[in-house]
C-alpha cells in the first residue's frame, strides 16, 4: 500500500461528507419547505353525498410567499368542497395582517373553517372573531356548526395550553349526523374520541426534521404518539397532517409539507 493512500482516502471521505452535508442543507432549507405533497384519502361514511375536504394546518405564514402561492395553486386544482384549518396560522402577533392576505385567497363552496392552535393562543388577537369573519373564515372556538345538514364540524381550542370546552363545543350537535372534530394538538384524541366520527389535527409538523432510520429530531408537547397519519380507536378515526409551514428554523428534512385531501364517500346500501 502506498504511504499516501490512507490520507487520500480520508480526504475523499471528508469531501464526500461535505458534499452530502451541503446537499442535505440545500434540500432542508430551500427544496423541501416549498415542495408541498398532496395526499389523497377516501373514507366510507354515513353521509348523504360525497364531501371533499382540504385539510390545512400549521401554515405559520408571513404573507403570500412562494409556498403560499403554490398552496393556492394546488387548492384551485383540487377544488375541495370544504377547507379546514387546524391552527397555527401565525408565529407572532405581527403575522395576523400577513395571514389575512392568505385567508382572503381561500375559497370553497361550503366555506373555510378554522380553529386555534398554540400560537394563536400565545398571541391572542383582540376582536378575533371579527378578524376571521372579515377575511371570509368561519371561526370555531369551542363551538359547532353545520357544514351540511348531515355533516357537523366541531372546533375546540388547543388543549395543550388553553381550555378545550368539550361539553360546550358539542352541545348543539344533533344526533344522527356525521361529526368531524377539528383541534390542533393530536394528543387530545385520547380524551375526546368517543364524541365524533372523524378528527383532523396538526401541531407535530410530522417532526419537521426526520432522521432516516431514527425518526423526528424533536416533537412539541401535545403530540403524544400521534406524529403523522391515520389513527383509530373504538370506531373513531383521526388524521394528523404534517402541515405547511415551519417553526424554530425554516427547515424540513425527510418531511415534506402536506396538503391532505380527504373525501367522504356515502356508504353502500
List each language-model region with its residue ranges.
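Beta-strand-turn-beta hairpins that frame and shape the catalytic cleft
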Residues: 42-54, 137-138, 144-155, 176-178, ...
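Membrane-embedded segments
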Residues: 47-143
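Catalytic metal-binding/acid-base residues of hydrolase active sites
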Residues: 60, 89-90, 119-120, 144-145, ...
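N-terminal membrane-anchoring alpha-helices
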Residues: 1-47
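Conserved beta-sheet core of the metallophosphoesterase superfamily
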Residues: 186-263
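Mobile, glycine- and charge-enriched loop segments
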Residues: 31-65, 172-180
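Conserved acidic residues
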Residues: 81-83, 110, 177-180, 197
Amino acid at each position: 500500500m502506498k504511504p499516501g493512500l490512507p490520507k487520500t482516502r480520508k480526504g475523499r471521505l471528508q469531501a464526500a461528507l461535505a458534499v452530502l452535508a451541503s446537499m442535505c442543507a440545500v434540500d432542508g432549507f430551500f427544496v423541501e419547505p416549498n415542495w408541498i405533497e398532496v395526499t389523497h384519502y377516501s373514507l366510507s361514511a354515513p353521509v348523504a353525498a360525497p364531501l371533499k375536504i382540504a385539510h390545512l394546518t400549521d401554515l405559520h405564514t408571513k404573507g403570500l410567499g412562494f409556498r403560499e402561492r403554490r398552496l393556492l395553486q394546488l387548492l384551485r386544482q383540487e377544488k375541495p368542497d370544504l377547507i379546514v384549518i387546524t391552527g397555527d396560522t401565525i408565529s407572532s402577533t405581527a403575522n395576523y395582517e400577513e395571514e389575512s392576505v392568505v385567508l382572503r385567497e381561500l375559497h370553497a363552496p361550503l366555506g373555510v373553517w378554522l380553529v386555534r392552535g398554540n400560537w394563536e393562543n400565545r398571541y391572542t388577537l383582540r376582536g378575533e372573531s371579527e378578524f376571521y369573519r372579515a377575511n371570509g373564515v368561519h371561526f370555531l372556538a369551542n363551538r359547532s356548526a353545520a357544514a351540511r345538514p348531515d355533516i357537523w364540524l366541531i372546533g375546540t381550542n388547543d388543549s395543550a395550553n388553553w381550555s378545550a370546552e368539550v361539553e360546550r363545543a358539542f352541545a348543539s350537535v344533533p344526533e344522527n349526523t356525521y361529526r368531524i372534530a377539528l383541534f390542533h394538538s393530536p394528543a387530545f384524541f385520547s380524551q375526546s374520541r368517543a364524541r365524533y366520527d372523524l378528527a383532523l389535527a396538526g401541531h407535530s409538523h410530522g417532526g419537521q426534521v426526520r432522521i432516516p432510520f431514527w425518526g423526528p429530531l424533536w416533537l412539541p408537547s401535545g403530540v403524544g404518539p400521534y406524529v403523522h397519519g391515520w389513527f383509530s380507536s373504538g370506531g373513531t378515526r383521526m388524521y394528523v397532517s404534517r402541515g405547511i409551514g415551519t417553526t424554530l428554523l425554516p427547515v424540513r428534512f425527510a418531511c415534506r409539507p402536506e396538503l391532505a385531501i380527504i373525501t367522504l364517500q356515502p356508504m353502500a346500501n
